[in-house]
Amino acid sequence: MSKFTLPKDGGLIEAGLPIGIKHSYERIPAHIYEDEDAASERLAVKIAEGINKCEGVYRLGLSTGSSPVPLYKSLVRLHKEGKISFSNVEIFCIDEYYPAPADNQSRNRRLYSDLLAHVDIKPENVHIPKLSEILDTESVTAFCADFDAKATGLDLLVMGVGMQGQIGFNEAGASDKSRTRTILLPYSSRKRESKNFANIAETPDKAIGMGISTMLSAKKIYLIGWGEDKAQIVKQFTEDPIDPLSPVSFLQRHENISSYIDENAASLLIRNVAPWLVGPCEWTPKFIRKAVVWLCEQVQKPILKLTQGDYLKHGLGELLEQHGPYTQINIKVFNDLQHTISGWPGGKPNADDSTRPVPSSPFPKKVVIFSPHPDDDVISMGGTFIRLVEQGHDVHVAYETSGNVAVHDDVVLQHMDAARELGFGDRFDEVKEIIASKKPGQPEPRALLNLKGAIRRAEAKSAVRSFGLNDQTNCHFLNLPFYETGGIKKGERTQADIDIIIELLQQVQPHQIYLAGDLADPHGTHRVCTEAVLEAINQLKGEAWLEDCHVWLYRGAWMEWELGKVDMAVPLSPDEVIKKRHAIYRHLSQKDIVPFPGEDPREFWQRAEERTQNTARLYDELGMAEYQAIEVFVKLF
């Protein structure tokens, strides 16, 4: 199955670079791999080496959550291949809710389902700070002290890190002297964990967790992190000083600690943001653009005002030596960036396209926009969508998942009440009973999911009708099976998902495909959907129509492509910004209060506008024309 990674284009030349230089900006050395699977495989081998060398009992500490799951799979594979045995291993988990809930809502459910159930570990060698009922203060204190004594001095501790720097349930302000204890969970923790429960009211408010001092007693510590969502915290604990508001930073004091991260989690580290400050680089045209844009941000100047002194003072002497003089670099990068701007995302007919991002022919083009959820198309590239339709292209939009779990029960009842008032039948009480039958931690009833899916389909069709698209012939609701679990945890992507996409692509045979270029959660819906499309394309290799097909990547509501990577920038007029906003409004079930809003309190239309307006501002500051907003894309191939 295809894995989504962006092709490399220039960067730090690490071959032969001394380790001390490579990690020169890092307080915790970072081992960076292409994706979470590659990092987990290497880490699993390191763990296996430690276990196999140990003559006695090997004591391994593991964190909860989703970050260790790829590691579990790699360890299970090594076990099945006979390269590791857990018969002499003790496993210590760093936390659990107090009192411990049912197994399917336990903090350690993935540990059991993905690791312990598949290896030869002795049940008595699994240590979890788990109490099934509330005890008196003296008893629970004794339990914590006993667990802490056993968990002190672990051979190895492997932990994922939360986006706010929490490790386990050690949140901002936790003492570096803390030991295993009962913890009253703050609202932020409960909100974060509520996705595994019916609502925040059902989410536990207490836990038992290992303290920072206990963690620091381990002989060796490995931190792990995957996806762009973790990039900011990875930068903080890797390069920034200790900060009590980021508990993971206390681990910088450990003498034997390092991190295993993927390229997306490492994206904000200096050796990725400004690798010329670390060592020699490969200077490709896009990488030169990246460096010049970075330099403009440092000195607060447009491209054509940069001086030789600016380059030299900011570590870009090698660039001058290989590609100077500076005036030539400035002009080349200015022209390169200016040529990304095009108001014709499908190509301008009968025009010189030698410097345009999209060829003029064929015209019109057949286009497929893949939208992971039923609103990602208008949120992420609504302005470009408008232009493609209005400029006469045959545009199709494919909604990959139903998005049904992201609809509040109250929204369903409101729609049923409206249907009753309009005389289309009375199912209000029936649906109310279905909602009342829901059980915390269990999948939603299929009948309810079907209603929620119908609501989102109607909203999506309404939005694209406002662009002039025929919602009967050019809207495709794929309902990929991996998504239809009825809960937050989705199924694995399978060939059944791929086949649905292949059928659509063969039907349309597009010249352009637009995909969500999401680099965040490796197992999130956006990433899974994009990888499903790429796998479908891979299986279609050899089809004649693919020779003239190009794939363009857009970003979501929160993040944007850095200008060093951009291949096409589509400017939006003030009227197009308003038209896009009104299309987002059509998604009423997502407009104000949604079940899983994340940390950003802004509505989707606000996020989308601020993101595209900020991109326009960056182009303006670099010396380009000033636009109301700009949507940018990266060309995958």
Give the residues covered by each predicted segment.
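N-terminal glycine-/serine-/threonine-rich phosphate-binding loop
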Residues: 1-59, 352-354, 361
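ATP/nucleoside-binding phosphotransfer catalytic cores, i.e., glycine-rich phosphate-binding loops
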Residues: 2-7, 22, 219-315
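Ligand-binding beta-strand-loop-alpha-helix segment within the catalytic cores
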Residues: 7-27, 84-158
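Glycine-rich N-terminal segment of FAD-binding domains in flavoprotein oxidoreductases
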Residues: 53-81
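Active-site beta-strand->loop->alpha-helix modules in alpha/beta enzyme cores, enriched
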Residues: 134, 297-374, 378-547, 553, ...
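Short, surface-exposed, charged loop/turn segments at secondary-structure junctions
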Residues: 144, 163-185, 238-241, 527-536, ...
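Class I SAM-dependent methyltransferase SAM-binding "motif I" and its flanking Rossmann-like core
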Residues: 157, 164, 168-212
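Glycine-rich anion-binding loop/nest that anchors nucleotide
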Residues: 158-160, 196, 201-238, 245, ...
